[in-house]
Amino acid sequence: MRRNIFCLACLWIVQACLSLDRADILYNIRQTSRPDVIPTQRDRPVAVSVSLKFINILEVNEITNEVDVVFWQQTTWSDRTLAWNSSHSPDQVSVPISSLWVPDLAAYNAISKPEVLTPQLARVVSDGEVLYMPSIRQRFSCDVSGVDTESGATCRIKIGSWTHHSREISVDPTTENSDDSEYFSQYSRFEILDVTQKKNSVTYSCCPEAYEDVEVSLNFRKKGRSEIL
């Protein structure tokens, strides 16, 4: 009997030592994370998935070919240095992005800085997977001709790493089946017809390496007056 009690006590002590609460996990992440160092593994690029979920189209200027858009930018990647044993601990935590390495993604045809509208927190899972999905307002330069027609206009937005070539960061569109207008405001003066995403690999005159980007094509048109009253 005493032996069984002793074994149970030892097991409880081991589990207590192995278990981590959220404060422990956050402390460990802050201690091990290196925000300035890209987390490549064995010379393989960091695989980054990105997609845009459009929330609203606020303004379209057909004279200057500019569009003002609000969207969620869903970005995922893996950083194995952040992983922990979740057997007796939470399997995910929210972490300020200032404590993490974050891909230096930029929209190549943006004409304003991204205005982040939500708390700058990322979800980190126990296997090291990171999801960052801020709500962003930003202006882009793109062809908006035809926005008043039935077929609408198609604005193309290119997003890729600003400094890392394809041997350091591999960028791919998120593969998922969802309604393109699922999150889009019903009160917008515009409506989404279609959204497509594709991957590009481009070599620029400045550099010998290829750079990857995700090209998001937003097909939209202005609603009829009767539809927005």
UniProtKB/Swiss-Prot annotation:
<comment type="subunit">
    <text>Homopentamer.</text>
</comment>
<dbReference type="GO" id="GO:0016020">
    <property type="term" value="C:membrane"/>
</dbReference>
<keyword id="KW-0964">Secreted</keyword>
<comment type="function">
    <text>Binds to acetylcholine. Modulates neuronal synaptic transmission.</text>
</comment>
<feature type="glycosylation site" description="N-linked (GlcNAc...) asparagine">
    <location>
        <position position="85"/>
    </location>
</feature>
<dbReference type="GO" id="GO:0004888">
    <property type="term" value="F:transmembrane signaling receptor activity"/>
</dbReference>
<dbReference type="Pfam" id="PF02931">
    <property type="entry name" value="Neur_chan_LBD"/>
</dbReference>
<comment type="similarity">
    <text>To the extracellular portion of ligand-gated ionic channels family.</text>
</comment>
<dbReference type="InterPro" id="IPR036734">
    <property type="entry name" value="Neur_chan_lig-bd_sf"/>
</dbReference>
<feature type="domain" description="Ig-like">
    <location>
        <begin position="114"/>
        <end position="217"/>
    </location>
</feature>
<dbReference type="GO" id="GO:0045202">
    <property type="term" value="C:synapse"/>
</dbReference>
<keyword id="KW-0732">Signal</keyword>
<keyword id="KW-0393">Immunoglobulin domain</keyword>
<dbReference type="GO" id="GO:0005230">
    <property type="term" value="F:extracellular ligand-gated monoatomic ion channel activity"/>
</dbReference>
<feature type="disulfide bond">
    <location>
        <begin position="142"/>
        <end position="155"/>
    </location>
</feature>
<keyword id="KW-0770">Synapse</keyword>
<protein>
    <recommendedName>
        <fullName>Acetylcholine-binding protein</fullName>
    </recommendedName>
</protein>
<dbReference type="InterPro" id="IPR007110">
    <property type="entry name" value="Ig-like_dom"/>
</dbReference>
<feature type="signal peptide">
    <location>
        <begin position="1"/>
        <end position="19"/>
    </location>
</feature>
<dbReference type="InterPro" id="IPR006202">
    <property type="entry name" value="Neur_chan_lig-bd"/>
</dbReference>
<keyword id="KW-0675">Receptor</keyword>
<keyword id="KW-1015">Disulfide bond</keyword>
<keyword id="KW-0325">Glycoprotein</keyword>
<dbReference type="GO" id="GO:0043083">
    <property type="term" value="C:synaptic cleft"/>
</dbReference>
<dbReference type="InterPro" id="IPR006201">
    <property type="entry name" value="Neur_channel"/>
</dbReference>
